[in-house]
Curated annotation (Swiss-Prot):
Superkingdom classification of source: Eukaryota
Name listed for the protein in its UniProt record: Gem-associated protein 4
Assembly notes: Part of the core SMN complex that contains SMN1, GEMIN2/SIP1, DDX20/GEMIN3, GEMIN4, GEMIN5, GEMIN6, GEMIN7, GEMIN8 and STRAP/UNRIP. Part of the SMN-Sm complex that contains SMN1, GEMIN2/SIP1, DDX20/GEMIN3, GEMIN4, GEMIN5, GEMIN6, GEMIN7, GEMIN8, STRAP/UNRIP and the Sm proteins SNRPB, SNRPD1, SNRPD2, SNRPD3, SNRPE, SNRPF and SNRPG. Interacts with GEMIN3; the interaction is direct. Interacts with GEMIN5. Interacts with GEMIN8; the interaction is direct. Interacts with several snRNP SM core proteins, including SNRPB, SNRPD1, SNRPD2, SNRPD3 and SNRPE. Interacts with PPP4R2.
GO cellular component: a single term: nucleolus
Compartment(s) where it occurs, according to its Swiss-Prot or TrEMBL record: Cytoplasm; Nucleus; Nucleus, Nucleolus; Nucleus, Gem
Organism ancestry: Eukaryota, Metazoa, Chordata, Craniata, Vertebrata
Function per UniProt: The SMN complex catalyzes the assembly of small nuclear ribonucleoproteins (snRNPs), the building blocks of the spliceosome, and thereby plays an important role in the splicing of cellular pre-mRNAs. Most spliceosomal snRNPs contain a common set of Sm proteins SNRPB, SNRPD1, SNRPD2, SNRPD3, SNRPE, SNRPF and SNRPG that assemble in a heptameric protein ring on the Sm site of the small nuclear RNA to form the core snRNP (Sm core).
Length: 1058
C-alpha cells in the first residue's frame, strides 16, 4: 500500500482542526495536562475528526487513514520534550511523521488511550503497540494498564478485555508498510527505556523472547486489579473466556500442537458466524460475510510460539478458579436462561471446553510439583462441573448452514488455510454446481492448479452429474471446461499425477465413459491433433505436441494411446517423435486390475491390442521394433521430463516368451525383439533378467533350437522361422548365458545349483547338440554328453566329456557327430580339429576319412544355418591344409591337360569339386527325397555363399601372385582355368536341380563369366586370344544343356561378348 501524503492534505487538515477545537475547549489548560475525567468534555472534536477521516465517503481506504492518523498521534505522544534545534532539523528531513506531528499540539497518553477506546480500535492499538521496540512496547502497555485501573468505567473494562483478546489473536503484519515505517521511526528516534519518565521496574525482559508473553502476564495482573469493576454477565463471560484461552493456548497445549482439520476449522467458523448472526448486540452482526469470516478466522486460530512462565500459569489457574467460584452460579443461571445466546456466552463455554480437554492432557504429560498439580486438578474439576451445568449452550444451538458460503469466502480472500479449504470445496458434493460454487471456481482457477484438486473436482463432477440431481447440461460443460483449463495449466509431472488418478479411478476409458457427452469435439480434436503431429514431427514442436496430447489422454486414454501406437507403426519415421510424447506420460505404466491382460501395464495392453500380430509389411515390423526400443530407453529431449514406459522384463514376457516356437508366425519378430532388448539393456546396473525367470527362458530358446534339428521333417506350416534365423537364436542363447553367468552371485549357491540341475535335466529331452551349446555355462558342474561314437575318432578327456547312447548314432557315425560338434562354435570346431585322430601317413585311413567326411557333409549341410555352414567351409579348408582331407580332381571338364601352375588354387579347385560331389550325393536316388523345395532353396543358397567366397579368394590370389610367386609368375591363365571349372561345376549342379531353385546358381554362373571376361581382357596376346576362343566354344557346349531357354540364351549371349 502506498503510504500516501502524510503532510498537508485534506485529512490532516481535518485532524488538525479537531485538535484545535479540543485545545480551545480545554483552554487555558494545555492538552498535555488532560485527565481521564476531562475527556468526555474535550475529546469529542478529536473523535469526530477521526470518524470523518475514516468514513467511506472521505476516502477510498478509510481504515488505512484511521491507521495513519493514530500512528501520527502516537508518534506525537512518544516524541521527547524538549526537542533540540539539531534534532528538529534531522527529524524534519528523515522522520516521516515529524512534520505532520508538529501540526498537532503537544498531547499525553490519556488522549491516545481515550481516543482508541472511543473509536473501539483495540485491534489497531495492538498492531501499533507490537510494532514498537520491546521495551517501549512494555512501557506503553504498562501506561495503558495504569490508565485503565484508575477510575475504571464499564467502557474501560470492555476496552481492556478487547485489547487482551487482540493480544492473543495478534499474528503480526510483516507486509504492512505503515507499521514498518512506524517501527523504524520508534527504533531510530525514541529514547531508551531508562530515559522514559517513571519506567516500570518489572520490565527487564529478554528482547529475543516472544513479545506476547510479558504482555499477557501484565494483562493478567491488570485483570486482577479491575476484577471488581467487571459487571454484567457479558463482560464476565468475556473475562473468563480470555483467561481460559490464554491458559489453554499459551500454557497447556503441546509445544507443537496439531492444527485442527480443515473440516473442523470450517465448522468452527460457521459456528462463530452463526452466533454473530443471531447476536444482535455483537459488533459483527451487521458486517458483510467476508468481514465476518476474516474476523472469525482470527478468533478460531489462536496459536502460540512460546509458553507463559510457570509463575504466570499457576497464578492464572488460581485466579480462573477464584473467578469461577465467585461468578459461576450467576453465569450458569444466565446461560441456562433464554438470555444465554450471546457470542460472549458461546465463547465462554467453548473456551472452557477446550481448557478442560487440554488440562487433562497437560496433567498426564507434564511433571509438576504436588502443589502445582493440585492447583490445575482442582481448576479442571471446577471447569468440568461448570460445563456439566451449562452443556446445552453448545449442544442445543441450531446453526444455519452457511459452511459453503464461508468456505468460498475463505478461498476468495485467500485466508490462512484457503488451500485446505479448496480441497473441501472440490470434494463437497452438496455444494457442487450451485451458482456460487461455479462462480468461485471460475474466479479462483489459479488456486485449483494442483493435481489433487483437479482430481477431486473431476470425481465430484462425475459423481454429481451421474446422480439423480437435475443439473443443466450447459453448466456441466462450463464446469468441465474450467477444470480442464486448470489441468492444462499444470506442469507435466502434475498432469501425470492427474492421469494416474484418472486411470486408477475410471480405468482405460478415462473421463469418456462418464463425461464424453460434455467434452465437446473430442473425436475432432483427436483427428486434428494427430494429423498435425504426423505432418510436422519435430523436436521443436514437442512441447506443444505433449500439451495437445495431455488433454486428449485424460478424456479417453485408451483411444489416444492406441491411436499413437498405430501411427507410430504405420507412419514411416514418426515412431521416435510419438514415443517421446508417450514417454512424457509415465502414468501410462498403470497396471489394470481387470481385463484380458490384468497383469500387464496399460501401455503393453494398448500395443498388443492395436498393432501386435497385425503388421502388413516388414517396414511396420521395423518401426514397431524401434518404437519398443524408444519406449524402453527414451531419448531425453531438452526441457521435457520423460520416463521409460516399458521395462525389459515385461517386453520379454509379453512379446517374446509366448512366441518362442517354430510354429508361431511372430517367432522371427520376437527373436529380434529379444536381441534388441538384451543389447539395449546390457549396461543396466540392476540384474533385471531375474524377474523373467532366466532358466526357463534359456530352456525355451533351447527348445526352439531343438526344433531346428528336425527342421525339414516338419510340415511347412510349422516352419515359420527360416534356417537363416537359427544363427540369431544361437546368438541370443550365447548372450543370455553370458548375462546369467555374470550375475550368478545374485542367486544363492543352493538356488544356483538347483537351477543348473533343472536345466540340465530338461535338456536331456532335446537333441544332444543343443546341450553342447551350453558347454561353457555348465562348465565345472556337468560334463558334455556326446554320442559314444565320437570317442572312436577323437581323443576326448573323460574329465570333460561323457558318452551317451543316442538313437541314430550307431557304428560309423563318429564323423557325423564330430562334424555336428564343429558346427556349434568356432572354439569347439578348433578343439575338435585338434582332438581328431587320423593318421596322415596312412593313405587308406585318409581315403576312408575323406569318404566319411563327404557322407557326413551331405547329412549335415541341409540343416546348417549360414554361420554353421561357414564354419564347415573354414573347417574344410583347414583339413585340406593339413592334408587330412583328400578330394581327387576329375578330368570331366578338361579338354586338354593345361601346362599351368595350379598349386596356388589347389584349395579352391578342391572345394569346388567337393561341393559338386556333395550335390551329386544329395541329388542321388537315395537322398533326393530328403528335402522339400524350400530345403533345396536353402542348400543352394548355402552353396552360392561358399562359391562367392571362393571366387573372391581366386581374385585375391591372382592379384597377389606376382608379389608372392615372383614377377615372372603371372597367374592369369591359372585363374581363368579356375573360373571355367567353377562355372562348369555350377552348371552341372544346376542341371541336377529343379529349375525353381536354380536362380542363385544362375546368377553365380553369370558372375563367374564376368570374372572370366574381365580377367581375360587384361591379356590381349595372340595365344591368349586363341585359348579364349577354344574355351568359349567349350563353355558354350556346356551351357547348351542348361534350361530353361531364357537362362541358356542369356548365358550364351554373355559368352559371345567375350
Amino acid at each position: 500500500m502506498d503510504l500516501g501524503p502524510l503532510n498537508i492534505c485534506e485529512e490532516m487538515t481535518i485532524l488538525h482542526g479537531g485538535f484545535l477545537l479540543a485545545e480551545q475547549l480545554f483552554h487555558p489548560k494545555a492538552l498535555a495536562e488532560l485527565t481521564k475525567s476531562d475527556w468526555e468534555r474535550v475529546g469529542r472534536p478529536i473523535v469526530e475528526a477521526l470518524r470523518e477521516i475514516s468514513s467511506a465517503a472521505a476516502h477510498s481506504q478509510p481504515f488505512a487513514w484511521k491507521k495513519k492518523a493514530l500512528i501520527i498521534i502516537w508518534a506525537k505522544v512518544l516524541q521527547p520534550h524538549p526537542v533540540t534545534p539539531s534534532d528538529t532539523e534531522t527529524r524534519w528531513q528523515e522522520d516521516l511523521f515529524f512534520s505532520v506531528g508538529n501540526m498537532i499540539p503537544t498531547i499525553n497518553h490519556t488522549i491516545l488511550f481515550e481516543l482508541l477506546k472511543s473509536l473501539e480500535a483495540s485491534g489497531l492499538f495492538i498492531q501499533l503497540l507490537m510494532a514498537l521496540p520491546t521495551t517501549i512496547c512494555h512501557a506503553e502497555l504498562e501506561r495503558f494498564l495504569e490508565h485503565v485501573t484508575v477510575d475504571t468505567s464499564a467502557e474501560d473494562v470492555a476496552f481492556f478485555l478487547d485489547v487482551w483478546w487482540e493480544v492473543m489473536k495478534h499474528k503480526g503484519h510483516p507486509q504492512d508498510p505503515l507499521l514498518s515505517q512506524f517501527s523504524a521511526m520508534a527504533h531510530k528516534y525514541l529514547p531508551a527505556l531508562d530515559e522514559f519518565p517513571h519506567p516500570p521496574k518489572r520490565l527487564r525482559s529478554d528482547p529475543d523472547a516472544c513479545p506476547t508473553m510479558p504482555l499477557l502476564a501484565m494483562l493478567l495482573r491488570g485483570l486482577t486489579q479491575i476484577q471488581s469493576r467487571i459487571l454484567g454477565p457479558g463482560r464476565k463471560c468475556c473475562a473468563l473466556a480470555n483467561l481460559a484461552d490464554m491458559l489453554t493456548v499459551f500454557a497447556l497445549t503441546e509445544d507443537d500442537p496439531q492444527e485442527v482439520s480443515a473440516t473442523v476449522y470450517l465448522d468452527k467458523l460457521a459456528t462463530v458466524i452463526s452466533v454473530w448472526n443471531s447476536d444482535t448486540q455483537n459488533p459483527y452482526h451487521q458486517q458483510a460475510l467476508a468481514e465476518k469470516v476474516k474476523e472469525a478466522e482470527r478468533d478460531v486460530s489462536l496459536t502460540s510460539l512460546a509458553k507463559l512462565p510457570s509463575e504466570t500459569i499457576f497464578v492464572g489457574c488460581e485466579f480462573l478458579h477464584h473467578l469461577l467460584r465467585e461468578w459461576g452460579e450467576e453465569l450458569q443461571a444466565v446461560l441456562r436462561s433464554s438470555q444465554g445466546t450471546s457470542y460472549d456466552s458461546y465463547r465462554l463455554c467453548d473456551s472452557l471446553t477446550s481448557f478442560s480437554q487440554n488440562a487433562t492432557l497437560y496433567l498426564n504429560r507434564t511433571s509438576l510439583s504436588k502443589e502445582d498439580r493440585q492447583v490445575v486438578s482442582e481448576l479442571a474439576e471446577c471447569v468440568r462441573d461448570f460445563l456439566r451445568k451449562t452443556s446445552t449452550v453448545l449442544k442445543n444451538r441450531a446453526l444455519e448452514d452457511i459452511t459453503a458460503s464461508i468456505a468460498m469466502a475463505v478461498i476468495q480472500q485467500k485466508m490462512d488455510r484457503h488451500m485446505e479449504v479448496c480441497y473441501i470445496f472440490a470434494s463437497e458434493k452438496k455444494w457442487a454446481f450451485s451458482d456460487e460454487w461455479v462462480a468461485c471456481l471460475g474466479s479462483n482457477r489459479a488456486l485449483f492448479r494442483q493435481p489433487d484438486l483437479v482430481l477431486r473436482l473431476l470425481e465430484t463432477v462425475i459423481d454429481v452429474s451421474t446422480a439423480d440431481r437435475a443439473i443443466p447440461e450447459s453448466q456441466i460443460r462450463q464446469v468441465i471446461h474450467l477444470i480442464l483449463e486448470c489441468y492444462a495449466d499444470l506442469s507435466l509431472p502434475g498432469k501425470n499425477k492427474v492421469l494416474a488418478g484418472i486411470l486408477r479411478s475410471w480405468g482405460r476409458k478415462g473421463l469418456s465413459e462418464k463425461l464424453l457427452a460434455y467434452v465437446e469435439g473430442f473425436q475432432e480434436d483427436l483427428n486434428t491433433t494427430f494429423n498435425q503431429l504426423t505432418q510436422s514431427a519435430s523436436e521443436q514442436g514437442l512441447a506443444k505436441a505433449v500439451a495437445s496430447v495431455a488433454r486428449l489422454v485424460i478424456v479417453h486414454p485408451e483411444v489416444t494411446v492406441k491411436k499413437m501406437c498405430s501411427l507410430a507403426v504405420v507412419n514411416l519415421g514418426t515412431h521416435k517423435f510419438l514415443a517421446q510424447i508417450l514417454t512424457a506420460f509415465p502414468a501410462l505404466r498403470f497396471v489394470e486390475e481387470q481385463g484380458p491382460n490384468s497383469s500387464a501395464t496399460f501401455m503393453v495392453s494398448c500395443l498388443k491390442e492395436t498393432v501386435w500380430m497385425k503388421f502388413s509389411t516388414p517396414k511396420e515390423e521395423k518401426q514397431f521394433l524401434e518404437l519398443l526400443n524408444c519406449l524402453m530407453s527414451p531419448v531425453k529431449p531438452q526441457g521435457i521430463p520423460v520416463a521409460a514406459l516399458l521395462e525389459p522384463d515385461e517386453v520379454l514376457k509379453e512379446f517374446v516368451l509366448p512366441f518362442l516356437r517354430l510354429d508361431v508366425e511372430e517367432v522371427d519378430l520376437s527373436l529380434r525383439i529379444f536381441i534388441q532388448t538384451l543389447e539395449a539393456n546390457a549396461c543396466r546396473e540392476e540384474y533385471w533378467l531375474q524377474t523373467c525367470s532366466p532358466f526357463p527362458l534359456l530352456f525355451s530358446l533351447c527348445q526352439l533350437l531343438d526344433r531346428f534339428s528336425k527342421y525339414w521333417q516338419l510340415p511347412k506350416e510349422k516352419r515359420c522361422l527360416s534356417l537363416d534365423r537359427k544363427d540369431l537364436a544361437i546368438h541370443i542363447l550365447e548372450l543370455l548365458c553370458e548375462i546369467v553367468s555374470a550375475n550368478a552371485e545374485t542367486f544363492s549357491p543352493d538356488v544356483w545349483i538347483k537351477s543348473l540341475s533343472w536345466l540340465h535335466r530338461k535338456l536331456e529331452q532335446l537333441d544332444w547338440t543343443v546341450g553342447l551349446r551350453l558347454k561353457s555355462f555348465f562348465e565345472g558342474h556337468f560334463k558334455c554328453e556326446v554320442p559314444a561314437t565320437l570317442f572312436e575318432i577323437c581323443k576326448l578327456s573323460e574329465d570333460e566329456w561323457t558318452s551317451q547312447a543316442h538313437p541314430g548314432y550307431g557304428a560309423g557315425t563318429g564323423l557325423l557327430a564330430w562334424m555336428e560338434c564343429c558346427c556349434v562354435s568356432s572354439g569347439i570346431s578348433e578343439r575338435m580339429l585338434s582332438l581328431l585322430v587320423v593318421d596322415v601317413g596312412n593313405p587308406e585311413e585318409v581315403r576312408l576319412f575323406s569318404k566319411g567326411f563327404l557322407v557326413a557333409l551331405v547329412q549335415v549341410m541341409p540343416w546348417c544355418s549360414p554361420q554353421e555352414w561357414q564354419r564347415l567351409h573354414q573347417l574344410t579348408r583347414r583339413l585340406l591344409e593339413k592334408q587330412l582331407l583328400h578330394v581327387p580332381y576329375s578330368l570331366e571338364y578338361i579338354q586338354f591337360v593345361p601346362l599351368l601352375n595350379l598349386k596356388p588354387f589347389a584349395q579352391e579347385l578342391q572345394l569346388s569339386v567337393l561341393f559338386l560331389r556333395t550335390f551329386q550325393f544329395l541329388c542321388s536316388h537315395s537322398c533326393r527325397d530328403w528335402l522339400p523345395l524350400e530345403g533345396w532353396n536353402h542348400v543352394v543358397k548355402l552353396l552360392c555363399g561358399s562359391l562367392t567366397r571362393l571366387l573372391d579368394s581366386v581374385r585375391a590370389i591372382q592379384a597377389a601372385g606376382p608379389w608372392v610367386q615372383g614377377p615372372e609368375q603371372d597367374l592369369t591363365q591359372e585363374a581363368l582355368f579356375v573360373y571355367t571349372q567353377v562355372f562348369c561345376h555350377a552348371l552341372h549342379i544346376m542341371a541336377m536341380l529343379h529349375p525353381e531353385v536354380c536362380e542363385p546358381l544362375y546368377v553365380l554362373a553369370l558372375e563367374t563369366l564376368t570374372c572370366y571376361e574381365t580377367l581375360s581382357k587384361t591379356n590381349p596376346s595372340v595365344s591368349s586370344l586363341l585359348q579364349r576362343a577354344h574355351e568359349q566354344r567349350f563353355l558354350k557346349s556346356i551351357a547348351e544343356g542348361i534350361g530353361p531357354e531364357e537362362r541358356r540364351q542369356t548365358l550364351l549371349q554373355k559368352m559371345s561378348s567375350f
